[in-house]
Design a protein with these regions (language model features):
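Glycine-rich FAD pyrophosphate-binding loop
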Residues: 25-51
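C-terminal catalytic lobe of FAD-dependent flavoproteins
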Residues: 321-381
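Conserved Rossmann-like nucleotide-cofactor binding loop
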Residues: 16, 40, 244
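Dinucleotide-binding Rossmann-like beta1-alpha1 core, especially the glycine-rich loop
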Residues: 52-128
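Short, Lys/Arg-enriched N-terminal segments with co-localized hydrophobic residues
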Residues: 1-6
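Active-site/ligand-binding neighborhood in enzyme catalytic cores
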Residues: 94-101, 105-236, 245
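Mid-domain catalytic core of redox enzymes
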Residues: 27, 220-340
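N-terminal Rossmann-like FAD-binding beta1-loop-alpha1 element of flavoenzymes
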Residues: 8-34
Length: 381
């Protein structure tokens, strides 16, 4: 037997890790080892066929690919066929299902209006939006966009359930991107590309990792692996996990993350449980934030259905960075340590958890491609 010497070690096999591995193996023809502490590839995009119902389920919550980035769209189409999917979301408010994002229909149903045109909607928004000299937090951001009534009904408690903080305690960026439509368009996204991978995300990521130069070792943490290895063995180490986990030996306080708890229920001989794939529950008296019914996605066929209610939590796998001043200040300290590691040990920190930044899927892939071009390709030349 001979020992393979890997040129690059990638920690984490989510979108970021898989993209960088694919690029290094195919563009540079170099050996890559990916390790992941979980028992599966795909990070939080991992999906699987549920044995009882035959329905494709995303283990860590619904993922809809949407983007205006043609470059990334062309890239992902190398590894999967994608099916156009215009995602719609309902919110259960005042004992009825209303469409999200806020559009003319939402306003008519929740505010007893009879708006018919975009001009009328613009006038209503102008009259309703709260004016601030400077916006300092998410409550002000939201009220400046939808006014007091919709803020109270749809956003205030929903945000609290998501973050365990009221909008006034969160950076304005959290609710900056809530879409508002001045028409009847009830699609959740208005991006050029909106799609789901025909055979699921796990298959898509599997197809990214087929190159002979890529090896995979699951159920392996970075700390365990490094007990028998040395940083100097590798041309580069790409770490895509939580940055504070990597520097857990430093005396900097830990960063905050939000997690999700999932409660799965199966219903035999039921066509659909709810009218839509995703229903938000913004009211305070319901503990979960939303219910996802996966059968709706790609119009899957089954005599049964499966629904997953999602509850946000401080405990569990880190999913979302919590953007407030404390965490952003701490992250800067970690970033200084990361820059030292990059310069001295060729350890690079890339991705949502490593950059302590919320990325959509297309942004995670674009970020990984940019990293490869700037930091790996440029140093090879």
């Amino acid at each position: 037997t001979y020992i393979i010497y890997y040129m690059y070690l990638i920690v984490g096999c989510g979108l970021t890790g898989a993209t960088i591995a694919e690029r290094i193996s195919s563009e540079l023809n170099e050996e890559v080892l990916i390790i992941d502490k979980r028992e599966h590839i795909g990070g939080n995009c991992y999906d699987y066929i549920d044995n009882d119902t035959g329905i494709l389920v995303c283990k860590y919550g619904a993922h809809i690919y949407r983007s205006n980035d043609e470059n990334v769209w062309n890239y992902i189409n190398r590894f999967s066929e994608w099916v156009r999917w215009e995602h719609k979301v309902l919110s259960y408010v005042d004992n009825k299902f209303v469409s999200v994002p806020v559009n003319i229909t939402t306003v008519n149903e929740l505010c007893d209006e009879t708006i018919q045109t975009s001009d009328e909607m613009d006038t209503w928004l102008e009259k309703t939006q709260v004016k601030y000299d400077t916006i300092t937090n998410s409550e002000e951001m939201c009220k400046s966009r939808v006014g007091n009534v919709l803020y109270d009904k749809m956003f205030k408690n929903y945000t609290y359930k998501q973050w365990n903080k009221y909008p006034e305690e969160l950076n304005a960026s959290v609710l900056r991107n809530i879409p508002i439509r001045n028409n009847f368009d009830c699609r959740y996204f208005d991006h050029k590309y909106q799609a789901l991978p025909k055979k699921g995300y796990t298959k898509f990521i599997e197809n990214m990792l087929t190159h002979k130069n890529i090896s995979l070792q699951l159920n392996t943490t970075y700390d365990e692996y490094m007990k028998t290895h040395n940083k100097s063995e590798f041309k580069g180490i790409i770490f895509t996990g939580p940055i504070d986990e990597y520097f857990s030996h430093s005396n900097i306080e830990k960063l905050e993350y939000r997690s999700l708890q999932f409660d799965i229920k199966r219903y035999k001989n039921m066509n659909y449980y709810q009218p839509n794939s995703v229903v938000n529950y913004p009211e305070y008296n319901v503990p979960f934030t939303r219910i996802v019914e996966y059968k709706h996605f790609l119009n899957q066929q089954s005599t049964d259905t499966i629904v997953v209610s999602e509850t946000s939590s401080d405990i569990g796998e880190p999913y979302y960075p919590v953007p407030n001043e404390r965490n952003l200040t701490l992250y800067k300290k970690y970033k200084n340590l990361a820059e030292y590691e990059e310069t001295n040990n060729h350890v690079f920190f890339v991705g949502r958890l490593a950059n302590y930044k919320y990325f959509n899927m297309d942004e995670a892939i674009a970020n990984a491609l940019h990293f490869f071009n700037e930091k790996i390709m440029n140093t090879v030349k």
